Curated annotation (Swiss-Prot):
InterPro entries: ZPR. Residues 97-122 form a coiled coil. Interacts with REV. The lineage of its organism: Eukaryota, Viridiplantae, Streptophyta, Embryophyta, Tracheophyta. This is Protein LITTLE ZIPPER 1.
Amino acid sequence: MQREHKTHNKLSFIYITPLYISPINQTRLTYLSSSFLLSSSSKMCLSSSETFSDTPTRLVLYLKTQSHVRIPRLSRRRRMWREEKKMEMINLKLYVENQNIIRENEKLKKKALLLHQENKTLFSLLQTKKLSSVHK
């Protein structure tokens, strides 16, 4: 942005560059301004950090909207990536836990089968003893 001021036969050009755009306070913007004072006898350059309450230029508005669009997208992408990684870890833990439960279940099934077979044999032995005691 360029502003032209005429003061006491001196022509000064002020180049204003946005230094920082505050997302919280959008009415006042901080600019870095460089003032070039030109006269026939001397050339002078002044730099200062000033605050202007002017309406921002199109470039400043564009930069503001771009920063507001990029930052949430990036943070949203990072947040989604972290949540996906967290979900993957939870899924992996649940998978391992399920595999352990399945193995334990198989062991218990084998044990139940052996106990059932033992119960059958004991029951058949009991039946044979009852039959032999009845026949005596």
